[in-house]
């Protein structure tokens, strides 16, 4: 059974044990401090799980969040990798400003793969092994 691990106005995190990944569903306009706070909470959750895969869903993100893009790329991703992240499927938003921010935050690593639709991202995570 799926387990909701975090629910805030800007993000919902759910663990899917049958396929062993966490789904991070970002919602609405993302304020800089909310990204930092929620990102830290996601990191703490991930550190406690025996899980190595993330489905990062930006389909519901509205507007830019570029002020936190550097932090995401330079701090959050390295910390997630230290915590055991091996596969990160990133579903990009349709919103052009949110997409620009996501592109800025995307690290140069084989761990992170960009997808334009949810089903392709989910299918990829189900086929990769940790």
Segments and roles (model prediction):
Residues 2-130:
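Amphipathic, Lys/Arg-enriched alpha-helical "gate/interface" segment within cytosolic domains
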């Amino acid at each position: 059974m799926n387990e909701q691990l975090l629910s805030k106005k800007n993000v919902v995190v759910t663990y899917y044990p049958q396929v062993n990944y966490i789904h991070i569903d970002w919602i609405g306009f993302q304020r800089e401090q909310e990204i930092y706070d929620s990102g830290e909470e996601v990191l703490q959750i991930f550190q406690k799980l025996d899980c190595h895969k993330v489905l990062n869903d930006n389909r519901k993100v509205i507007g830019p969040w570029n002020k936190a893009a550097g932090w995401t790329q330079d701090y959050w991703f390295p910390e997630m990798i230290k915590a055991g992240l091996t596969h990160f499927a990133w579903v990009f938003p349709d919103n052009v400003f949110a997409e620009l921010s996501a592109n800025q935050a995307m690290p140069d690593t084989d761990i992170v793969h960009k997808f334009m639709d949810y089903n392709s991202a989910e299918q990829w995570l189900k086929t990769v092994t940790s």
